[in-house]
From Swiss-Prot:
Family designation: Belongs to the XseA family.
Swiss-Prot/TrEMBL keywords: Cytoplasm, Exonuclease, Hydrolase, Nuclease
This enzyme's EC code(s): 3.1.11.6
Gene field: xseA
Location relative to the cell: Cytoplasm
Function of the protein: Bidirectionally degrades single-stranded DNA into large acid-insoluble oligonucleotides, which are then degraded further into small acid-soluble oligonucleotides.
EC class name: hydrolase
Protein name, entry field: Exodeoxyribonuclease 7 large subunit
């Protein structure tokens, strides 16, 4: 009898795929320490080996694009530290490791600590560019924190003596390797800040292995460099060696000698610059003096040309020339004025106003006579037209018509009577005659019939 709910049934392929996804997603990337065995490298360039310890082993693969970054040749039995992803090879169901990076076991553990501390300090902002202090230019005093017996101090002092022998140097001796080295380096940095004798610090040592340089990967040293009020130049190992101190320092120099180059002035270069400036100054002075001499010569020549005696002679000559021109111009002007006077006299005689006045008076008398005659004729004609108009008006005047026996009758409202239908019995009428007005009352109204005209047939 079957149960009420059947369990999930996996195919082999689905099972291997599910396990692979669980391993990749849940485990992610891990660090593994172990011993190499069964190392092989086929023609593809990939590495295949087993990583084991005393009680267990696991198959590993490192592909060509990853193993080309490994700086050593893995050997059978070698202890290594690998960074890898856990997965499952589905066709065979084999659980295996895909290696991304590999280091010898001792250096590998240190490198892992290095990466962890680097990530931590970077997250806190100790590497940010905004906190980097500017180095003094030029430096007036240099502090060196390193071993008093190491090659790094010798290199630094040699470069400073060659480049800037007058630059003061204060040495803060300290161990640079061993368990006590980080604490001594921190105390030296703090002492330099307390004494405040120098304006830049060089912190470093010569080259060595990762273990030899490990003091400069110490968190205490990194925080002391970051807290320093004096700018710090890190100079640890060779150019390929990069420590935590290099990230925190205000400037990283690839070597101690390079750090000395950075903080010092090149006296020989300064001397060459001074000599070059002196040459430019001499050339400028020569040019200036030559220019002033040429200017003096020009001014002297102009001064000679403008000597008072020469100027007086030129002005005297100019005065005589102007005097001659003025005399000649005056004579010509007087001559032209005389000729003009003669022409005007002749014109005045020809245009004497007496004759013109006589002719004008005669003309005025003639015009006055003609005007009087014209006015008399127009007045006579006007009187005649006025008399005719008066006679005509009297002929057509209503008063003249009334004087001939006619009358005009009007009703009480002033309307002229033209027909009997306008009059009513008992109504008062006003009749105007030639010599007065008659007021009458209507006693009867009789309408006269009009006679019809007979029309004869043609």
């Amino acid at each position: 009898m079957l149960p009420s709910q059947s369990p999930a049934i996996f195919t082999v392929s689905r099972l291997n795929q599910t396990v692979r996804l669980l391993l990749e997603h849940e485990m992610g990337q891990v660090w593994i320490s172990g011993e190499i065995s069964n190392f092989t490298q086929p023609a593809s360039g990939h590495w295949y080996f087993t990583l084991k310890d005393d009680t267990a082993q696991v198959r590993c693969a490192m592909f060509r694009n990853s193993n080309r970054r490994v700086t050593f040749r893995p050997q059978h039995g070698q202890q290594v530290l690998v960074r890898a992803n856990i997965t499952l090879y589905e066709p065979r169901g084999d659980y295996q490791i895909i290696v991304e990076s590999m280091q010898p076991a001792g250096e590998g553990l240190l490198q892992q600590k290095y990466e962890q501390l680097k990530a931590k300090l970077q997250a806190e902002g100790l590497f940010d560019q905004q906190y980097k202090k500017t180095l003094p230019s030029p430096a007036h005093c240099v502090g060196v924190i390193t071993s008093k017996t190491g090659a790094a101090l010798h290199d630094i002092l040699h470069v400073l003596k060659r480049r800037d022998p007058s630059l003061p140097v204060i040495i803060y001796p300290t161990a640079v390797q061993g368990d006590d080295a980080p604490g001594q380096i921190v105390r030296a940095i703090e002492l330099a800040n307390q004494r405040n004798e120098c304006d830049v610090l060089i912190v470093g040592r010569g080259g060595g292995s990762l273990e030899d340089l490990w003091s400069f990967n110490d968190e205490r040293v990194a925080r002391a460099i970051f807290a320093s009020l004096i700018p710090v130049v890190s100079a640890v190992g060779h150019e390929t060696d990069v420590t935590i101190a290099d990230f925190v320092a205000d400037l990283r120099a690839p070597t101690p000698s390079a750090a000395a180059e950075v903080v010092s002035r090149n006296q020989q270069e300064l001397l060459r610059q001074v000599q070059s400036a002196q040459q430019r100054l001499e050339m400028a002075m020569d040019y200036y003096l030559a220019n002033r001499t040429r200017r003096f010569t020009q001014i002297h020549h102009r001064l000679q040309q403008q000597h008072p005696q020469l100027r007086l002679a030129r002005q005297q000559t100019m005065l005589e020339r102007l005097q001659k021109r003025m005399s000649f111009a005056l004579e010509n002007q007087l001559k032209r004025a005389g000729q003009q006077q003669q022409r005007l006299t002749r014109q005045l005689v020809q245009q004497n106003p007496q004759s013109r006045i006589h002719r004008a008076q005669t003309r005025i008398q003639q015009l006055e006579y003609r005007l009087a005659e014209t006015l008399r004729a127009q007045l006579s004609a006007t009187r005649e037209r006025f008399g005719n108009a008066v006679t005509h008006l009297e002929a057509v005047s209503p008063l003249s018509t009334l004087a001939r026996g006619y009358s005009v009758t009007s009703a009480a409202d002033g309307a002229l009577l033209k027909q009997v239908k306008q009059v009513k019995v008992g109504e008062t009428l006003t009749t105007r005659l030639g010599d007065g007005v008659v007021i009458s009352e209507v006693s009867a109204v009789t309408k006269t019939r009009k006679s019809r005209k007979k029309t004869s047939n043609p």
